[in-house]
UniProtKB/Swiss-Prot annotation:
Gene for this chain: PTAC12
The name this protein goes by in its record: Protein PLASTID TRANSCRIPTIONALLY ACTIVE 12, chloroplastic
Feature: transit peptide: 1-30
Sequence motif: Nuclear localization signal 2, positions: 235-242
Function: Involved in plastid gene expression. Acidic transcriptional coactivator necessary for the transactivation of many PIFs target genes (class B genes), particularly during the regulation of hypocotyl growth. Plays dual opposite roles in regulating hypocotyl growth, preventing it in red and far-red conditions, but promoting it otherwise. Required in the nucleus for the initiation of photomorphogenesis mediated by phytochromes (PHYs) (e.g.
Presence of the UniProt keyword Transmembrane in the record: no
Record keywords: Chloroplast, Nucleus, Phytochrome signaling pathway, Plastid, Stress response, Transcription, Transcription regulation, Transit peptide
Organism phylogeny: Eukaryota, Viridiplantae, Streptophyta, Embryophyta, Tracheophyta
Keyword Transcription regulation: yes
Length: 527
């Protein structure tokens, strides 16, 4: 390093001293030391003029800037100022390692990609330290508005700020900043009063503290459960409006649980069936409701004791399970409470154990689900799981429709709904309609001469047989096989013969049963 007599510099892998050759060494830095330094002469060669930019790390006073500016013009160096980051690395909570705060490996995105609210928090964290001294301890939000401009006057009288006469420029600039900041704000008269009013529920809601869902001062208590006809939304029932009847959810996990909670008294419903609004509110808070039930179970276990608490799941245990009986049994036989519990659980069936413990002993069972009735269980888990016939998986994010007054009505039965609208009739009505219908009369047209001549197999060549055939079958019907089975249709009126040329469709209709006639005729003529 440097001694007092001579100064040694290590620059770009070369050692330079003031006594040695200094033509290959360029120094652009001020060194502040506690001992005097000799003047260092730096020579510049033509090779050094084409060097890269020098980076200026910190500003000096104004005189230094002027001299450096002249140096820039003389020596041809361009100074580039780089704003340094407030910190070089930080502890990333995701990876648990030190991450760089800037550069290609930095995991902090730009401000454009920050989530909502991050910019304001960063801006608040970068706020300068207040100049004055606090005369009291912080209230942590208990008296809001205490730091406003109206209340600042009282604290400013007690604060004495020591200023230094030497730094006059910084004083002027700070005064100008204070004036600018005071001029930039507008204070309304009722702002302080509004801040004072925000206490309790409003303040908790604003600051994000835990608060009830509805303001306790404005919440109306439910006196009694109303029927569906007495509810306020049922004031007018449309006669033929069918869409609202389908707004009721089918009984699934949420509706059945909510109705069971209303039966146990944990919540109160406005009607007989839970509405869509009540179901969505329960879905958002079902974890809190379960925690309430588990807390009630823990309190009951501490109050009654484990013997009385767990005897609910051992039906075969008929002894007294009160605390007095357990203590008396301990005094008589010397068996403590754990031994009596083991004795009681030895009488527990497999089904009772599965209901009490569930599939995983680490997961606390829901007391409401453990004590559900059989009909409630069938409403949730009934039917075929492969092809569900009772309960279907419903969309939890379905958009609710509150247009009608009776959206809370239960879903109607599909068959009765179709019967009401005349879309479906019963089997008895169908058979009655069939008996009333007349038998359809089939019209038998005359056979054309050309068609009769075309049907000739050639087996009967005798003239006598031909004459008999002409007498018997003077009028050959079109659907011969049908007339053979139902001879009463032969008396029907013949179809009027069309004159003139026939279209293609009419010709096809006229000859549709020709093949049937030929096949039937062939069966009769077989030997």
């Amino acid at each position: 390093m440097a001694s007092i007599s001579t100064t040694t510099w290590l620059y770009r892998g070369q050692v330079c001293t003031d006594s040695g050759k200094s033509s290959n060494c360029i120094v652009q830095r001020r060194v502040k030391c506690g001992f005097p330094l000799k003047t260092l002469h730096a020579g510049i060669t033509s090779r050094d003029r084409s060097l890269r930019h020098c980076i200026k790390c910190k500003k000096e006073d104004g005189d230094g800037d002027v001299s450096e500016g002249s140096k820039k013009s003389e020596e041809g160096f361009e100074y580039v100022t780089v704003e340094r980051h407030p910190y070089h690395s930080y502890m990333d909570s995701t990876s648990g390692k030190l991450e760089p705060a800037s550069g290609a490996r930095a995991s902090i995105p730009g401000e454009d990609y920050w989530p909502e609210g991050t910019s304001s928090r960063v801006r608040a964290a970068r706020a300068p330290q207040p100049a004055g001294e606090s005369s009291s301890f912080p209230s942590y939000g208990k008296n809001p508005g205490s730091r406003r401009k109206k209340n600042r006057k009282a604290t400013e009288e007690n604060v004495t700020v020591e200023t230094n006469d030497e730094v006059s420029d910084s004083e002027d600039s700070s005064e100008e900043e204070e004036n600018d900041s005071s001029d930039g704000f507008v204070t309304y008269k009722n702002e302080f009063e509004r801040e004072e009013e925000e206490t309790g529920f409003e303040l908790d809601k604003k600051l994000g503290r835990p608060h009830p869902f509805i303001d306790p001062t404005k919440k109306k208590q439910i006196e009694k459960t109303l029927t569906s006809d007495e509810s306020w939304w049922n004031w007018r029932k449309p006669e033929k409006e069918q869409w609202s009847r389908w707004q009721r959810r089918r009984p699934d996990v949420e509706t059945v649980f909510l109705k069971a909670m209303a039966e146990t008294g944990q919540v109160k419903l406005y009607g007989e069936e839970p509405t869509l609004t009540e179901t969505s509110l329960y879905r958002a808070r079902r974890h809190l409701f379960k925690e309430e039930r588990l807390q009630a179970e823990r309190e009951r276990l501490a109050k009654e004791g484990p013997m009385a608490f767990y005897s609910e799941w051992v039906k075969a245990w008929k002894r007294d399970t009160s605390r007095e009986a357990v203590q008396k049994h301990f005094e008589e036989t010397g068996e403590d409470e754990n031994t009596q519990l083991i004795e009681m659980f030895s009488h527990q069936t497999d089904r009772e154990y599965r209901i009490m413990m569930g599939t995983d002993i680490r997961i606390k069972r829901d007391p409401l689900a453990m004590r559900m009735r059989e009909d409630q269980i069938k409403q949730i888990w009934g039917g075929d799981p492969v092809y569900p016939t009772i309960n279907y998986i419903q969309d939890p994010n379905a958009v609710m429709d509150f247009r009608g007054p009776d959206f809370h009505e239960p879903t109607p039965n599909m068959l009765s709904y179709l019967k009401e609208n005349g879309k479906v009739i019963s089997r008895e009505m169908h058979e009655a309609l069939l008996t009333k219908e007349k038998t359809e009369q089939l019209e038998v047209p005359d056979m054309d001469d050309a068609m009769a001549q075309a049907v000739d197999i050639g087996e009967n060549d005798d003239d006598e047989d031909d004459a008999d055939v002409e007498k018997d079958d003077e009028k050959v019907p079109r659907n011969w096989s049908v007339l053979k089975e139902t001879p009463e249709l032969r008396t029907a009126k013949p179809k009027p013969k069309k004159e003139g040329r026939m279209s293609l469709d009419e010709a096809v209709d006229d000859a549709e049963n020709l093949t049937d006639f030929l096949m039937d005729f062939e069966e009769e003529t077989d030997p």
